[in-house]
Amino acid sequence: MGKIIDINSRAAFQRDVLEAEIPVIVDFWANWCGPCKVVAPELELLAKAYGEDLRIVKVDVDVNQDIAVEYGVQSIPTIALFRSGEWVAATVGAKRARVIEGDLGLASATGAHEATN
């Protein structure tokens, strides 16, 4: 895959996250959030490193408030790992790709890779 998908509806979240057959990173963010802009290139690195083994999506909490509330997102960026439709790990704040990998346990979740950052 290697690209980041914008989620703009509950149906898209259901399809691209909850029904995904591969692990999914969900970046809960907002356009006005400075740290969210800082973490964006780090997520691009992860998308490139993991390719087809991992999906990365962005959920704008201003557009998708119901999803953010459902998952108890109180700070952004919140970066969550979903596996088989379940939230299994999360990290909060702007972090380097390698730290995000460690916080989310990505190597064990995908059986793969490591970001080059």
State the predicted function of each range.
Residues 1-3:
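N-proximal helix/coil linker or "cap" segments that precede and/or mark the start of modular domains
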Residues 5-24, 65:
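A short beta-strand-turn-helix
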Residues 21-22, 28-32, 75:
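Short pre-active-site segment immediately N-terminal to redox-active cysteine/selenocysteine motifs
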Residues 25-26, 56, 79:
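Hydrophobic beta-strand anchors of alpha/beta hydrolase catalytic cores
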Residues 33-36, 79:
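The canonical Cys-X-X-Cys-His
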Residues 35-50:
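Typically the conserved alpha-helix immediately C-terminal to a functionally engaged Cys/Sec
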Residues 54, 59-68:
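Structural microenvironment flanking redox-active thiols in thiol-disulfide oxidoreductases
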Residues 75, 80-116:
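Non-catalytic, surface beta->alpha helical segment in thiol-disulfide oxidoreductase systems
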